[in-house]
Amino acid sequence: MGKLTLLLLAILVWLQYSLWFGKNGIHDYTRVNDDVAAQQATNAKLKARNDQLFAEIDDLNGGQEALEERARNELSMTKPGETFYRLVPDASKRAQSAGQNNR
């Protein structure tokens, strides 16, 4: 009976070792779970960005407001009867910001 108990104990020790330290053990399991959680967070951010881009595409295809906004902001276009004003910072402020950028 002692040899059987010793054999079963040796098998139990081997199984525990492989569970904790072996390939596909607890450490690998926790690492993979962390990787999956990080990937799911990344996927959620990308899905939100895709949804935003699809909404912008739909707005550009169907609505004139987004097209008008882009024309105003990027091309500085105005409607008939409107006056365009460009605000230019003071020369002293420009010199200060240029001096800070050179550092």
Curated annotation (Swiss-Prot):
GO biological process: FtsZ-dependent cytokinesis
Record carries keyword GTP-binding: no
Assigned keywords, A-Z: Cell cycle, Cell division, Cell inner membrane, Cell membrane, Coiled coil, Membrane, Transmembrane, Transmembrane helix
Transmembrane annotation, as ranges: 4-21
Coiled-coil zones: 31-71
Pfam families attached to this UniProt entry: DivIC
A GO CC annotation given for this chain: cell division site
Periplasmic side: 22-103
Subcellular location: Cell inner membrane
Membrane topology classification: Single-pass type II membrane protein
Functional description taken from the UniProt entry: Essential cell division protein. May link together the upstream cell division proteins, which are predominantly cytoplasmic, with the downstream cell division proteins, which are predominantly periplasmic.
PANTHER family associated with the record: CELL DIVISION PROTEIN FTSB
Stated name of the protein: Cell division protein FtsB
Biological source species: Shigella boydii serotype 18 (strain CDC 3083-94 / BS512)
